[in-house]
């Protein structure tokens, strides 16, 4: 299966513009032979939407947009992040979600389980955690789709610093996922890339599954997202990497077993910090 990693720069609350960006990248990926296009966390709303989520019209506009994209979808299939209604009767009423869209409808959806409430994150204020999960079926592939923090709780890698009891990725593997896909909006900080690469490598190796990690890119207010999306083999080897600090699109063929394109451009802390500052200021002014 040819899978496109669509590392796009979305704007918080600019739902029509984000939809247009999604469609543009789907068309580009389709021309390259993609069968599935993966977008970052909360693609439709941008990340983080914060108190915009308290506005019913905003949530409804996002739901209408995901319905529109579902009707528009044919081939390739899409994995798109959006804000869904949760099933909680007494909770927040919303979920951080991803939908599998194909052939004119929503084929499946997933609600994020692990909601970070530390540092720059406050997702527990806005969202209810997921309550059920299962792999998404696309053709003969069983996709173990998770969202950002869901990947950051491996019991072996975080042996002494584990924040949650439950590991959605482990559960996805237990239920027969052939392939792991994590859609993220993971902000940049100095030194984080090295830790993230080690973790993703360890998770893919422990579960013996190819792992596709798609990160957001761009600046949204005080947060800067560095992109750097990656693919890891079942042996934990990095097979591909997208550019850091700019939009990018890469096709990964699941038949690939040896390292391919490595597009990362900034390999030391000073260069990464400079690139982050330039991107953050540029997007703050532009958006």
Feature-to-residue mapping (PLM):
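Enzyme catalytic cores with a strong preference for nitrogen-chemistry domains
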Residues: 1-287
């Amino acid at each position: 299966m040819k899978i496109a990693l669509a590392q796009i720069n979305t704007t918080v609350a600019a739902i029509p513009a984000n939809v247009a960006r999604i469609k543009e990248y789907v068309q580009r990926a389709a021309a390259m032979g993609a069968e599935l296009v993966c977008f970052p966390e909360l693609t439709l709303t941008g990340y983080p939407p914060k108190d915009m989520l308290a506005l019913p019209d905003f949530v409804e506009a996002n739901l209408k947009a995901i319905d529109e994209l579902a009707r528009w979808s044919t081939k390739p299939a899409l994995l798109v992040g959006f804000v869904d209604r949760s099933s909680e009767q007494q909770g927040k009423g919303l979920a951080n979600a991803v939908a599998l869209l194909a052939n004119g409808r929503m084929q499946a959806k997933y609600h994020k389980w692990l909601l970070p409430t530390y540092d720059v994150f406050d997702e527990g204020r806005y969202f209810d955690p997921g309550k059920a999960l299962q792999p998404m079926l696309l053709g003969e592939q069983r996709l173990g789709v998770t969202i950002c923090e869901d990947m950051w709780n491996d019991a072996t890698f975080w042996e002494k610093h584990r924040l949650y009891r439950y590991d959605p990725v482990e559960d996805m593997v237990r239920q027969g996922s052939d392939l792991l896909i994590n859609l993220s909006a993971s902000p940049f900080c100095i030194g984080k890339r090295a830790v993230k690469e080690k973790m993703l490598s360890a998770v893919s190796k422990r579960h013996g599954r190819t792992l596709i990690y798609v990160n957001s890119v761009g600046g949204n207010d005080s947060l800067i997202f560095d992109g750097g999306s990656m693919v890891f083999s079942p042996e934990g080897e990095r097979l591909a990497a997208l550019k850091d600090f700019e939009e990018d699109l890469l096709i990964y063929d699941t038949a690939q077993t040896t390292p391919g394109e490595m597009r990362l451009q900034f390999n030391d802390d000073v260069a990464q910090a400079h690139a982050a500052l330039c991107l953050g200021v540029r997007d703050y002014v532009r958006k």
